[in-house]
């Protein structure tokens, strides 16, 4: 039994930036530092930051006055930003710049009076933040959430000749393409972004899993259950006809999964650290794996800048 690693896997530039913002804020300003929502969707990362002095909350009313709050990588609504400003909270924004790009698109369409369809998963914090960029006082349009092709068939848009779509950044590329095609068939005048809203890291990791699935008879995806992009990786492997499981770490591996398997693929969602992958490899070795290889993959070199104040404090 051998193991094959997907490439790329694990942390993306947006996750790296978000985690680093929390760490540096704690180092420079001291604990506690409040973080609205899990800064990234990974249990191990969140627990580590808690130990360093981060306090995770779901709403700003849980943050005491005169404190610092960090917005998670998933982004927040304009209402949340306005509340933080009204209360005079010090804010560091860890929103992924690629999510911010989608926010700007929605705000631009709103000002232009267009209707907007957001393709995404209801209840996901990124979707809530993006929907919350819509300012009903700034335009005459409306924003709609679509989760699947079935909803497209019954969608009623007020301005079918004047609307655009955007997407959550961590969706299945294949599923999203199907929804966009269905929308365009019903509404030929629909506008879209100049570049796909699904982020480069999501695309690259899904391409890598598709390649992995061709070579393996089991694919393990390291990631937490609430991680959208990690769930999509496991779903994609199964769609390719391969047994696949989403695991938070080595402790969740069932030895029965590897019985009779010859080639085990391992990857990690964009919010899962390499240390968890290392633990999975060690556990697979205990279960009889005798070699680890790695696929060639799309190189990733993107780096997102930290907030200016945290960069300056590092120099000081």
UniProtKB/Swiss-Prot annotation:
This protein's name: 4-hydroxy-3-methylbut-2-enyl diphosphate reductase
Membrane-spanning residues: none
Pathway in which the depicted protein is active: Isoprenoid biosynthesis; dimethylallyl diphosphate biosynthesis; dimethylallyl diphosphate from (2E)-4-hydroxy-3-methylbutenyl diphosphate: step 1/1; Isoprenoid biosynthesis; isopentenyl diphosphate biosynthesis via DXP pathway; isopentenyl diphosphate from 1-deoxy-D-xylulose 5-phosphate: step 6/6
The enzyme's E.C. designation: 1.17.7.4
Binding-site positions, (2E)-4-hydroxy-3-methylbut-2-enyl diphosphate: 41, 74, 124, 169, 227-229, 271
Catalytic residue list: 126
Annotated Gene3D superfamilies: 3.40.50.11270, 4-hydroxy-3-methylbut-2-enyl diphosphate reductase, catalytic domain (3.40.1010.20)
Function: Catalyzes the conversion of 1-hydroxy-2-methyl-2-(E)-butenyl 4-diphosphate (HMBPP) into a mixture of isopentenyl diphosphate (IPP) and dimethylallyl diphosphate (DMAPP). Acts in the terminal step of the DOXP/MEP pathway for isoprenoid precursor biosynthesis.
Binding site for dimethylallyl diphosphate: 41, 74, 124, 227-229, 271
Binding site for isopentenyl diphosphate: 41, 74, 124, 227-229, 271
Family: Belongs to the IspH family.
Cofactors, names only: [4Fe-4S] cluster
Keyword terms of this UniProt record: 4Fe-4S, Iron, Iron-sulfur, Isoprene biosynthesis, Metal-binding, Oxidoreductase
Binding site for [4Fe-4S] cluster: 12, 96, 199
GO molecular function terms noted in the UniProt entry: 4 iron, 4 sulfur cluster binding; 4-hydroxy-3-methylbut-2-enyl diphosphate reductase activity; metal ion binding
Cofactor binding annotation: Binds 1 [4Fe-4S] cluster per subunit.
GO biological process, one term: terpenoid biosynthetic process
Catalytic reactions on record: isopentenyl diphosphate + 2 oxidized [2Fe-2S]-[ferredoxin] + H2O = (2E)-4-hydroxy-3-methylbut-2-enyl diphosphate + 2 reduced [2Fe-2S]-[ferredoxin] + 2 H(+); dimethylallyl diphosphate + 2 oxidized [2Fe-2S]-[ferredoxin] + H2O = (2E)-4-hydroxy-3-methylbut-2-enyl diphosphate + 2 reduced [2Fe-2S]-[ferredoxin] + 2 H(+)
Signal sequence residues: none
InterPro entries: LytB/IspH
């Amino acid at each position: 039994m051998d193991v094959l690693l997907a490439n790329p896997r694990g942390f993306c530039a947006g996750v790296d930036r978000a985690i680093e913002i929390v760490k540096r804020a704690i180092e420079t300003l001291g604990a506690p530092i409040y973080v609205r929502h899990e800064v990234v969707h990974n249990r191990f990362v969140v627990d580590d930051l808690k130990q360093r002095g981060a306090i995770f909350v779901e709403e700003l009313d849980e943050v005491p006055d005169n404190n610092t709050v960090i917005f998670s990588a998933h982004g927040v609504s304009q209402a949340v930003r306005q509340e933080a400003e009204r209360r005079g909270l010090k804010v560091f924004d860890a929103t992924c710049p690629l999510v911010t790009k989608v926010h700007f698109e929605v705000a631009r369409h709103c000002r232009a009076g267009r209707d907007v369809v957001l393709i995404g998963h209801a209840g996901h914090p990124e979707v809530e933040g993006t929907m919350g960029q819509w300012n009903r006082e700034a335009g005459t349009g409306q924003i709609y959430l679509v989760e699947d092709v079935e909803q497209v068939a019954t969608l009623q848009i007020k301005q079918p000749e004047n609307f655009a779509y955007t997407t959550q950044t961590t969706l299945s590329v294949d599923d999203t393409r199907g929804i966009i095609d269905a929308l365009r068939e019903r509404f030929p005048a629909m506008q879209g972004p100049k570049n796909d809203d699904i982020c480069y890291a999501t695309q690259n990791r899904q391409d890598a899993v598709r390649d992995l699935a061709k070579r393996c008879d089991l694919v393990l995806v390291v990631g937490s259950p609430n991680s959208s992009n990690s769930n999509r990786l496991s779903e994609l492997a199964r769609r390719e006809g391969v047994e696949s499981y989403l695991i938070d770490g080595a402790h969740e591996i069932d030895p029965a999964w590897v019985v009779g398997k010859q080639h085990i693929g391992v990857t990690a969602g964009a919010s899962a650290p390499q240390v968890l992958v290392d633990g999975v490899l060690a556990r697979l070795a205990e279960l009889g794996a005798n070699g680890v290889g790695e696929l060639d993959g799309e190189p990733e070199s993107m780096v997102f800048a930290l907030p200016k104040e945290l960069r300056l404090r590092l120099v000081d």
